[in-house]
Amino acid sequence: MRIHILGICGTFMGGLAILARALGHDVTGSDANVYPPMSTLLEQQGISLTQGYDPQQLNPAPDLVIIGNAMSRGNPCVEAVLENNIPYVSGPQWLHDFILRDRWVIAVAGTHGKTTTSGMIAWILESCGMAPGFVIGGVPGNFDVSARLGDSPFFVIEADEYDSAFFDKRSKFVHYCPRTLVLNNLEFDHADIFDDLNAVKKQFHHLLRIVPGKGKVIWPEQDHNLRHVIGMGCWSEQETTGPQGQWLTQKSCSDASRWTVKLNNDVVAEVEWGLVGEHNMHNGLMAIAAARHIGITPQDAAKALNEFVNARRRLELRGTVNGIEVYDDFAHHPTAILATLSALRSKIGGTRRILAVLEPRSNTMKLGVSKNELAPSLARADEVFLFQPSHIPWQVSDVAEACVQPVQWSADITHLVAMITKSVKPGDVILVMSNGGFEGIHQKLLDSLSTLQLVK
């Protein structure tokens, strides 16, 4: 079968392309921007890519077109598919029909930590010899791809609440039919498609409706939004984490690089790993609980986590110049920003300065839904540098005025780099946060710092 994928260079759609190729299909695809590393990864799999959406790419017609959720009516290829009656399907629906239908699906949903927790579960299963399949919204550090078929019944998936396609506005995750469901947390996000928090809760309720009765739902009992969703109806077995739950963690050191696992008040495992931060400790606990549901002991799961390497862009050190470290993180929501800064502070101690650099790039950020929460979320930074994107209906200067620490902002990346370079001191740590490429600011900072004559 020849399958053509519209929007192929997104992490999820690229993962589907890899899976389709592994099934033996002839796979082609197109995207508005065909660029590494995804383009390189796909071409290495023998997948032919086209830049742009000229409808001639559909001549001769493929057997099936998988349409990404970034596509909309008016796209030349979408119009050609509809006009010529070419069979089409959404990515999540294809994944269900051709991959997940007969698998034991372990799904990780929630506002934060999906990629990390999914990667942890996949690595635990891999380390324990279970060779799982997976689709994850990033390349886990212990693997070299973001998706694979696997050689066992188990399939791990990052379960996103974003919509499936222009013709299917249901959340992606309702297609996945999980037997083991991890709910990390729940906050309002994706303001471009959800009117309010209740609309998000409704989709999570729909997800709970399709978990089998003998399946397992694992969730943190202290999360009030998830508690409300569970209260809307849950027909499956449950396990909870937190002070009143079955599962509990306890830090053995301040940065949470060592911690113990308790199950029903008994210590059942200890973890000592390369990650830091209480948010990662929480993610690790959820992964251990999920692994236990499929028969892996907490001790074996913890042993695997000791060797876990996170996906890129999760507090990733991009370089050190003249004693100044530049970190990169995917954080783009106030809760994630606060957690990342807290983790970095615990990692470097209380004496070194943190310079936080933020691009409000996500759709929710662009709409200004969370702008009033940004200043408090940045409180652990010693200085803040904000990028002002064009074409958003609010000004980052409003956030700057609400911050208690020194703040500078600019609408020009070069100017922003110059500001940071002028302010930096020996031993400082620069943390760049964005869910996009941020115009290559990380390398621009490293290049600028390399020419800097620091004055102590």
Question: How would you label these PLM feature ranges?
Answer:
Residues 147, 259-261, 316-321:
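Short acidic-hydrophobic surface loop/beta-edge motif
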Residues 74, 78, 179, 226, ...:
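A general structural signal for well-ordered alpha-helical segments in protein cores
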Residues 1-38, 43-49, 60-61, 65, ...:
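ATP-dependent carboxylate-amine ligase
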Residues 19-23, 43, 56-60, 69, ...:
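Phosphate-binding loop of NTP-binding sites
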Residues 251-269:
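Acidic-glycine-rich active-site phosphate/pyrophosphate-binding loop
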Residues 8-9, 30-31, 52-53, 68-70, ...:
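Fold-independent oxyanion-binding glycine-rich loops
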Residues 50-53, 91-96, 134-138, 233-254, ...:
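Beta-strand->loop->alpha-helix junctions that form or flank phosphate-binding loops
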